[in-house]
A protein has these predicted regions:
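Short, charged cytosolic
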Residues: 2-22
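Hydrophobic transmembrane alpha-helices and their membrane-interface boundaries in multi-pass
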Residues: 41-133, 150-156
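Alpha-helical transmembrane segments and their helix-membrane boundary motifs
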Residues: 31-47, 63-72, 136-147, 169-174
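Alpha-helical transmembrane segments and their immediate juxtamembrane flanks
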Residues: 159-208
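Amphipathic alpha-helical coiled-coil "transmission" helices that mediate dimerization
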Residues: 192, 199-253
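Transmembrane alpha-helices and their extracellular/periplasmic helix-loop junctions
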Residues: 87-93, 116-121, 143-148, 152, ...
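Juxtamembrane membrane-interface segments at transmembrane alpha-helix termini
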Residues: 81-82, 109-114, 133-143, 157-166, ...
C-alpha cells in the first residue's frame, strides 16, 4: 500500500494540509463529497448506540439507569448533528461537531467500562467507536488521532479514579492503542487518497480550461478567416461585374 505519492509530496506530513490556497478549495470539495455520508452515518450510529442499551439490561442491571442516561445524552447529540446537517451552517463547523460527538461517544463507553471493567462487551464497544471514527463519519486524520489518544488518556485516568485493576487497564490500553493505530493508518491513507484525487481534479479542470480556451481561439480564427474569405469573395464578384461592364461598354463602343 502506498502512503505517499509524488503528486502529494507538497502536503504537510502531519496535518496533510496543502501549503497554499488549495487547502480551502479542498475542504469545500471534501465537504461536498462527504456530508451526505456523514449524515447517514450519524443516523445509523444513533440507532446502534441506542440499540446496545438492550445489552445494558442484560449485563449491567445494577447500572442500567445510569447507562441509559449516558446513551440518551449521546444519542440526542448524534441526532442533533444529523438534523443540523440539513442546514447551510453545517459546512462551517461540521468537522468540529464530528470531533466533539466522536469524543463524547467514546467517553460514554469509557464510563460504562470503568464501572464494569470485567464485562468485555464495553471494551469491544469502544473499539467499534474507534472504527466508526476512522472510516465512517468522515473525520479527518489529525482530528481522529487527537481525539482517540485523548480517549486513551481519559480511560487511564478514569481507571485510576475508579480503582480498576491495573492488569485490566493495561490489557485494554494495548488493544485500544492497536485499534487506534490501525484506524490512523486507514484514516491517513484515505485522506492522502482523497487529496490525490482532488489534486488530479484540479489538473484536469486546468487542462479543460486550456482546451476550451484553445477551442475558442480556434473558433475565433476560423470566424476571422471566414469573414476574410467572404470579403475576398465579395471583392472578386465586384471585380467580375466591373470587368463584365467594361467589356460590355467596349463591345457597344
Amino acid at each position: 500500500m502506498v502512503f505517499w505519492t509524488e503528486l502529494t509530496n507538497q502536503l504537510n506530513r502531519v496535518t496533510l494540509n496543502f501549503p497554499d490556497e488549495r487547502e480551502k478549495e479542498y475542504r469545500d470539495f471534501y465537504f461536498v463529497r462527504s456530508y451526505k455520508t456523514t449524515r447517514v452515518a450519524y443516523l445509523i450510529l444513533a440507532l446502534l448506540y441506542a440499540f446496545f442499551g438492550y445489552l445494558d439490561s442484560v449485563v449491567a442491571r445494577q447500572y442500567f439507569d445510569l447507562f441509559i442516561i449516558i446513551r440518551v445524552i449521546v444519542v440526542i447529540t448524534l441526532l442533533f448533528v444529523f438534523f443540523y446537517s440539513y442546514l447551510n451552517k453545517f459546512r462551517i463547523n461540521w468537522q468540529t461537531l464530528i470531533f466533539i460527538t466522536y469524543f463524547l461517544g467514546a467517553v460514554g463507553i469509557i464510563l460504562m467500562l470503568v464501572m464494569l471493567p470485567e464485562v468485555v462487551v464495553y471494551s469491544s464497544g469502544l473499539i467499534l467507536v474507534f472504527l466508526a471514527g476512522s472510516v465512517l463519519i468522515k473525520l479527518r486524520f489529525l482530528a481522529f488521532s487527537i481525539a482517540s489518544w485523548l480517549v486513551i488518556v481519559i480511560y487511564v485516568i478514569a481507571g485510576i479514579l475508579w480503582k480498576v485493576d491495573y492488569s485490566i487497564v493495561l490489557s485494554n490500553v494495548f488493544f485500544f492503542a492497536g485499534a487506534i493505530i490501525i484506524g490512523m493508518i486507514a484514516a491517513y491513507r484515505t485522506e492522502v487518497f482523497n487529496r490525490d484525487n482532488f489534486n488530479l481534479y484540479l489538473q484536469i479542470a486546468k487542462k479543460n480550461v486550456q482546451i476550451e480556451q484553445a477551442n475558442k481561439n480556434l473558433e475565433d480564427k476560423v470566424e476571422e478567416r471566414t469573414k476574410l474569405l467572404n470579403f475576398r469573395n465579395k471583392e472578386l464578384k465586384e471585380e467580375v461585374k466591373r470587368r463584365a461592364l467594361i467589356e460590355k461598354e467596349l463591345i457597344t463602343a
